């Protein structure tokens, strides 16, 4: 279906015809743990990767398979692997690339959970991270050492929606024989497809825009199929015979889909962060309206940014659509149709004023999720990024007066009226 447009692909990929078992037009929920093999040789072929298909529910499921194929198509990849959460997708990606003694080069301004994973959790297993200012290309390249295994970015940083120069950083990574990993959770494939800009692996928290309704946890890893694992010489676990899977070379057995096949066959098999069939089904429902929702998110965001930028109680709006934002040129290059409906602003005052503003909103829900059809708000310094010390917070331009907004799809007049009510409460009105 590669000739179809995005809006058609999001509805049909993975189930081009009615379900063969039931004639169902909707993708069924295959609620099963295991699958019957036709005979012993069929079972052996499945386990040996000679025959593609279901083996066990921890590894594959037919509902999950449709979801994986659909997101892979939307991102322009060759294959995908769904996981139980976005955190699992990111963790598996790094674990597949780096082992004890290895290092990752990562953008400083990323989601707090990802920062904590790289800075603290993975160091317990001997994997370190060198955090860099992604806007300083010389700093990015100088951070690459012989033990570096990947470069890690976000298309839109969390929470400030800062934008790296993906094309330039991809060129640096590939010059050194390294894959570029990009978290496209905030960008979405409707607004930007990182593989077209040189990304080798794309990850998502599907909980966010893909699901879109705040109901379902899930993650997904998309393999571009473009990275040559053998030529790199740095990834023996993928390119060489793997003793934990009876000597299979995943590069040989799975070809362009080697990366996600390795994760499925080894990491998912051994640690089991499997997406449930029901969650895969719900995420498919979200995928089918992705383009429609994103258009409304973007439309509303433009108007909210304009409102905040001209408000006397706002110290600063951190949104790349503004001409004075340092990433404005990159925003116009990579997001010609708009984006960044999750962003921050600094209210005049400090923590007290930020809390007062947040606590007096009615439509905006105070919670730790983003990218919901409902508008959301949070104070990052005391919640999502509270594990960072003061220096780390300052490096990410998160202060006690910083407020993160996730703009939903409500009527724009109601959104702006709610924000104004928050400001009025701060004024004591």
Where does each model-flagged region fall?
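Short conserved active-site loop signatures built around small residues
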Residues: 1-30, 221
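Conserved PLP-enzyme active-site core in the AAT-like
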Residues: 2, 14, 18, 80-310
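Conserved N-terminal alpha-helix of the aminotransferase class I/II PLP-enzyme fold
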Residues: 39-88, 113-120
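Glycine-centered tight turns that cap/initiate beta-strands
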Residues: 76, 147, 313-316, 363, ...
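PLP-dependent enzyme catalytic core of the Aspartate aminotransferase-like
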Residues: 119, 128, 146, 293, ...
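Active-site beta-loop-alpha junctions enriched in small/polar residues
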Residues: 156, 185-187, 322, 348, ...
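Short hydrophobic/aromatic beta-strand micro-patches
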Residues: 222, 344-346, 406-408
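Conserved small-domain helix->loop->beta segment predominantly found in fold-type I
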Residues: 271-274, 278-280, 285-289, 294-296, ...
């Amino acid at each position: 279906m590669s000739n179809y447009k995005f809006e058609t692909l999001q509805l049909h990929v993975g189930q081009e015809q009615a379900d063969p078992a039931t004639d169902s037009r909707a993708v069924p929920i295959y609620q099963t743990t295991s699958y019957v093999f036709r005979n012993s040789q069929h079972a052996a072929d499945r386990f040996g990767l000679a025959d593609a298909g279901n083996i066990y529910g921890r590894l594959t499921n037919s509902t999950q398979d449709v979801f994986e194929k659909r997101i892979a198509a939307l991102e322009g990849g060759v294959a995908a692997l769904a996981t139980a959460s976005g955190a699992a997708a990111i963790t598996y990606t790094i674990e597949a690339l780096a082992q004890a003694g290895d290092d990752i080069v990562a953008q400083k301004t990323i989601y707090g959970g990802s920062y904590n994973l790289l800075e603290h959790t993975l160091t317990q297993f001997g994997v370190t991270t060198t955090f860099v200012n992604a806007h300083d290309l010389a700093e990015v390249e100088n951070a690459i050492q012989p033990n570096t295994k990947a470069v890690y970015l976000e298309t839109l940083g969390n929470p400030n929606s800062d934008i790296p120069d993906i094309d330039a950083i991809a060129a640096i990574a590939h010059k050194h024989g390294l894959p570029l990993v990009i978290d496209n959770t905030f960008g979405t494939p409707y607004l930007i497809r990182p593989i077209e800009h040189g990304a080798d692996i794309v990850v998502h928290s599907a909980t966010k825009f893909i699901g879109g309704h705040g109901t379902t946890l899930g993650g997904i890893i998309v393999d571009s199929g473009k990275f040559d694992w053998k030529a790199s010489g740095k990834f023996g676990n993928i390119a060489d015979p793997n003793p934990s899977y009876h000597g299979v070379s995943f590069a040989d057995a799975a070809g362009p889909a080697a990366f996600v096949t390795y994760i499925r066959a080894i990491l998912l098999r051994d640690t089991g962060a499997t997406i449930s069939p029901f969650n895969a089904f719900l995420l498919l429902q979200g995928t089918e309206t992705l383009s429609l929702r994103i258009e409304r998110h973007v439309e509303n965001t433009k108007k909210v940014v304009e409102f905040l930028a001209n408000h006397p109680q706002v110290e600063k709006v951190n949104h790349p659509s503004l001409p004075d934002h340092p990433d404005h040129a990159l925003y116009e290059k990579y997001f010609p149709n708009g984006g960044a409906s999750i962003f921050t602003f600094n209210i005049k005052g400090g923590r007290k004023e930020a809390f007062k503003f947040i606590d007096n909103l009615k439509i905006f829900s105070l919670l730790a999720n983003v990218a919901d059809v409902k508008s959301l708000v949070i104070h990052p310094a005391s919640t999502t990024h509270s594990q960072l010390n003061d220096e780390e917070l300052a490096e990410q331009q998160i202060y006690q007066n910083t407020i993160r907004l996730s703009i939903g799809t409500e009527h724009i007049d109601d959104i702006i009226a709610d924000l104004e009510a928050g400001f009025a409460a701060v004024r004591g009105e």
